[in-house]
UniProtKB/Swiss-Prot annotation:
This is ATP-dependent Clp protease ATP-binding subunit ClpX. The lineage of its organism: Bacteria, Bacillati, Actinomycetota, Actinomycetes, Micrococcales. GO terms for biological process: cell division; proteolysis involved in protein catabolic process. Zn(2+) binds at residues 13, 16, 35, 38. ATP-dependent specificity component of the Clp protease. It directs the protease to specific substrates. Can perform chaperone functions in the absence of ClpP. SUPFAM superfamilies: Glucocorticoid receptor-like (DNA-binding domain) (SSF57716), P-loop containing nucleoside triphosphate hydrolases (SSF52540). Component of the ClpX-ClpP complex. Forms a hexameric ring that, in the presence of ATP, binds to fourteen ClpP subunits assembled into a disk-like structure with a central cavity, resembling the structure of eukaryotic proteasomes. ATP binds at residues 126-133. GO terms for cellular component: HslUV protease complex.
Length: 426
């Protein structure tokens, strides 16, 4: 490129048409010319486009307030008020931090340069109580990429199993390989209690699926630029990698932590003196998980560095019969509504008597499967009738009774003709 000086021919900008005498500079290219004013205008357009793209990929979205997030969770998740409240605040603060980072700089406020640390979440509670569903619903409300990983499949680098970087690959896939969007997503790591250290004291033998995995997770939990193999599997030196910055990825790690309640109860029942002495209580609360302290998690088998990267700790409680009844009918996508919709697609109404719903909830409590077991029970009850209904055009309504659940009795069938006669007489 060359600057055009004075010449016999009067040259013009190929974009705005101004002559070389009307502008300060005219830059020549192969058969075209551009003036300094058009260059400046192009720079402004490029900056605006880049800023718009940055807003879309770095968290500049309509961030709902904690009460709005809580209200949305309330529409889908029954009970677990404390967990919903804690998650609403934690998620709001996380994405508020992401927004600050994208507009101000690397996690610093203007002037005082206060660094805003990331707050990942540890979710503790029995199986079937809605831990995974809470995280899925959060991601749905925020419209961010969401990935679920199983901690039991992970092993330390160099051993048979999955590397921790494969977790990030799932998030990238959930974002349709939009890395920038994935970098503000949510990763839910389940069964994290299964990677607890096998013994309270460090062992001289290698614990590749326990403490080793905790060590491997530290960096991505805290925030690092990880090299992710695009096809998954083990890394090898002759492959290309996707670079993913986990600084703004929210990690929600969860587990049932069976046996943790005994550790908490043992600590709460001890006597001592000084600042570390527990308060004496005559009896423990039913929700003993709500009393968990970092020292209990350490005794369970989580290393201190891992605990330190999960500053927000919240718990979910065992669901009782009343809560399970509400889960069947109240949420926007309640199980009963889902099955009623499936029957509607065959032109059949599905009705549940109150006694049937109570019996389904009682069975789930008895089996200790929580909300996850409700669908299995409904499949057992409705399976035979769902086999027959598509082939029988005479059926207009199916009524599930208590006997249908408890004694495997056939449901009450209302013929379509009877329903039509009742409608005409009405």
């Amino acid at each position: 490129m060359a600057r055009i000086g004075e010449s016999a021919d009067l040259l013009k900008c190929s974009f705005c048409g101004k002559s070389q005498k009307q502008v300060q500079q005219l830059i020549a290219g192969p058969g075209v010319y551009i003036c300094d004013e058009c260059v400046e205008l192009c720079n402004e357009i490029i900056e605006e486009r880049l800023a718009e793209a940055s807003e879309e990929t770095t968290g500049e979205f309509d961030l709902p307030k904690p009460k709005e997030i809580f209200g949305f969770l309330d529409e889908y998740v029954i009970g677990q008020e404390a967990a919903k409240r804690a998650l609403s605040v934690a998620v709001y603060n996380h994405y508020k931090r992401v927004r600050a980072v994208s507009t101000i700089g690397p996690a610093k406020t203007v002037g005082d340069e206060i660094e805003i640390a990331k707050s990942n979440i540890l979710l503790i509670g029995p199986t079937g109580c809605g831990k995974t569903y809470l995280a899925q619903t959060l991601a749905k409300r925020l419209n961010v990429p969401f990935a679920v990983a199983d901690a039991t499949a992970l092993t330390e680098a160099g051993y048979v199993g999955e590397d921790v970087e494969n977790i990030l690959l799932k998030l990238i896939q959930a974002a349709d390989y939009d890395v920038k969007r994935a970098e503000t997503g949510i990763i839910y790591i389940d069964e994290v209690d299964k990677i607890a250290r096998k013994a309270e004291n460090p062992s001289i033998t290698r614990d590749v699926s326990g403490e080793g995995v905790q060590q491997a997770l530290l960096k991505i939990l805290e925030g690092t630029v990880a090299s992710v193999p695009p096809q998954g599997g083990r890394k090898h030196p002759h492959q290309e990698f996707i670079q993913v910055d986990t600084t703004n990825v929210l990690f929600i790690v969860a587990g049932a932590f069976a046996g943790l309640e005994d550790i908490i109860s043992q600590r709460a029942g001890k006597k001592g003196i000084g600042f570390g002495a527990p308060l004496h209580r005559k009896d423990l609360n039913a929700d003993v998980f709500g009393e968990v302290l970092p020292e209990d998690l350490h005794k369970f088998g989580l290393i201190p560095e891992f605990i330190g990267r999960l500053p927000v700790v919240t718990t979910v409680t065992q669901l009782d019969q009343r809560a399970l009844m509400e889960i069947l009918t109240k949420p926007r996508n309640a199980l009963v509504r889902q099955y009623q919709r499936m029957f509607e697609l065959d032109g059949v109404e599905l009705e549940f008597e109150q006694g049937a719903l109570e019996s389904i909830a009682d069975l789930a409590v008895l089996r200790q499967t929580g909300a996850r077991g409700l669908r299995a029970i409904l499949e057992e009850v409705l399976g035979p009738i769902m086999f027959d209904i598509p082939s029988d055009d005479e059926v207009g309504r199916v009524v599930i009774t208590r006997e249908s659940v408890v004694q495997n009795a056939a449901p009450t069938i209302v013929p379509r003709a009877s329903m039509l006669r009742a409608e005409k007489s009405a």
